[in-house]
Amino acid sequence: MISHGKDIKIFTGNANPALAQEICKLIGIKLGEAEVKSFADGEASVSLYESVRGSDVFLINSTCKPVNDSLMELLIMIDACKRASAGRVTAVIPYFGYARQDRKAKSRDPISAKLVANMLTASGADRVLTMDLHASHIQGFFDIPVDNLLGNPVFVDYYAKKFGEKCENMAVVSPDVGSVARARTFAQKLHMSLAIVDKRRQKANQCEVMNVIGDVAGKDCILFDDMIDTAGSICNAAKAIVEVGGANSVYACASHGVLSGPALERLSSSVIKEVALLNTIPETMGAGCDKIKYLSVAPMFAEAIERIYQEISIAKLFN
């Protein structure tokens, strides 16, 4: 690593320490010494066991389950670093929770993503580094720099090696209209055709698949989305691709494996052959489902952190 006069320090909370360790190993530094624990009543407590004065500090903590605990850990870590005279604090949030609450869907709804942005800024964060925000316009909720890395290259590399020349006879399928832009870019990179599943959502976390737009008959398909929560949408989409569209087989991939409630059971019993997830959320969340394969985003975050530290553009990571 090239130094430019100030130390780099990386700390992690309890949300995804394995990813933080992997990032530090790639950069070639030790993970900072800190303790993030809870008092008997559940309050988060942070202790930094090394100086951060004047340092370029990166705090790694996905705001995943337990979501509110993970968020409070991050906020308190930021505050601790600022009060200890850190030169700059970057909140590294591989999975940004509350991103689905980015607008008022009905009367009197909160815009929780904006609230979280305000909280991160108020706590003292100087910039945010994240990946595949559920809604990219959330970057505009902040008054500080936000770098939203894309997981697309990781999946493109994986499937290009997995399927090789077969890619030209495969299809990428968006599970809904909202994911079409992501799926289109993914399909173009792999030289695959594009299809869309049209669905009608009945209530939260449930949906009814209606139709498949595009030709998937006889093809091996990849369902592409930004996250899998309860897995209802992805499993119903896969079923429609096979039963309605006549696809030969279905694979699935998503940047964030939230995997709540019945997700693992649904994926295990679905027609999906394999589910590729990024490790923005701990791999332990997928334990118990043999179909799940995790791909590491540590190299991408490590390079982004090094570039931010060295004051070099990270535009390369978006191309």
What do the PLM-derived regions correspond to, one by one?
Residues M1-N319:
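PRPP-associated nucleotide enzymes
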